[in-house]
């Protein structure tokens, strides 16, 4: 099935590309998510007329994501306290939701889906590097310091 992409899609293409995908992928994912429209003559003409508007909108979203990534990088570190044993091993773990809440409390709005933990959840006290994927092309890093509670 031929579709026109309205957004950048990983491993498929970027805005304006006409790609051939399986019908189920288009019907169940791309079209409902607003990432593509079927490539009919009417849709091709409509897209070409609105191409500049869509590209400007995509550029605005990218600029906003880069601004948020800069704010995250400027934070340098965020401290989270959690109950821990004698050797610094946490009772439980610190996951994406806890990190997103701590960063949001520090002043930068972050969703838990944007937090990337390359080594899994944090289970020990100390300093950990956490990655954020704010946009498909924009990444940020932040040090999270886990301190044991008394």
Curated annotation (Swiss-Prot):
An MF annotation (GO) of this entry: structural constituent of ribosome
Pfam family, one: Ribosomal_L9_C
A GO CC term assigned to this protein in UniProt: ribonucleoprotein complex
TM ranges: none
Protein function: Binds to the 23S rRNA.
Xref: NCBIfam families: L9
Family label: Belongs to the bacterial ribosomal protein bL9 family.
Record-given protein name: Large ribosomal subunit protein bL9
């Amino acid at each position: 099935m031929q579709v026109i992409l309205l957004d950048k899609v990983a491993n498929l293409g970027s805005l304006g590309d006409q790609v051939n995908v399986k019908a189920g992928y288009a019907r169940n994912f791309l079209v409902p998510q607003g990432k593509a429209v079927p490539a009919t003559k009417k849709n091709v003409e409509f897209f070409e007329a609105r191409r500049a508007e869509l590209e400007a909108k995509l550029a605005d979203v990218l600029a906003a994501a880069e601004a948020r990534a800069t704010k995250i990088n400027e934070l340098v570190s965020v401290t989270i306290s959690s109950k821990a044993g004698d050797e610094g091993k946490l009772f439980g773990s610190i996951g994406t939701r806890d990190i997103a809440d701590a960063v949001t409390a520090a002043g930068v709005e972050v969703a838990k889906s944007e937090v990337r933990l390359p080594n899994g959840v944090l289970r020990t006290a100390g300093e950990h590097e956490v990655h954020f994927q704010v946009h498909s092309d924009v990444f940020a890093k932040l040090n999270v310091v886990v301190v044991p509670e008394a």
